[in-house]
Regions:
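TRNA-recognition modules of translation machinery and tRNA-sensing kinases, especially anticodon-binding
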Residues: 1-169
Length: 169
């Protein structure tokens, strides 16, 4: 698959990234996308938790997908071995149906991660930002922890994600 695109980046380089900094990066990307397009975008968010929480979740996903993996696409078979979290990002309709019943990461978050996870929607609600929680949103890179997001054009919905990012430490 070939793609051509323009991109920009904004990163906070810090040893301790707090919730405010994470939300600042999200709001910067959201505002930039809306300014560039001239209209609202759809913001989808998820929370991947710490590395420890994510490892527990990966184990649960492996157990869930094990009975299904033989009937899944080749990408999902590879992802099952390498990183089962990425199966949630599969675009094959039959595999998406299986993913609907997969465990949710929020059930595998540590107590500390649970607190941070609960603060994100509250903070966005407090400032009036519209968003959708998408349990299947995992992003393509393994270094993300905590909040992840993708932005979609609300008018030209065939584009797929027009932006994305998240927290990594």
């Amino acid at each position: 698959r070939l793609r051509q695109f323009y991109q920009f980046g904004a990163e906070f380089i810090d040893t301790k990234i707090d919730l405010a900094s994470t939300l600042d990066a999200f709001l910067f990307a959201l505002t930039a996308a809306e300014k560039a397009l001239g209209h609202k975008v759809i913001a989808k968010i998820n929370f991947l938790g710490s590395l420890e929480s994510r490892e527990n979740y990966k184990a649960a996903l492996k157990a869930f997908f094990a009975p299904h993996v033989d009937s899944m696409c080749d990408d999902c078979k590879r992802r099952f071995e390498v990183n089962p979290l990425r199966i949630l990002d599969c675009k094959v309709q039959e595999d998406q149906e299986i993913c609907k019943d997969a465990p949710k990461i929020k059930d595998y978050l540590s107590e500390e991660d649970q607190k941070e996870y609960q603060n994100i929607p509250k903070a966005l609600d407090d400032i009036g930002v519209s968003y959708e929680v998408d349990d299947s949103l995992v992003r393509g890179l393994d270094y993300y922890t905590g909040l992840v997001f993708e932005l979609y054009d609300s008018i030209n919905t065939t584009l797929g994600a027009i932006g994305g990012g998240g927290k990594y430490a």
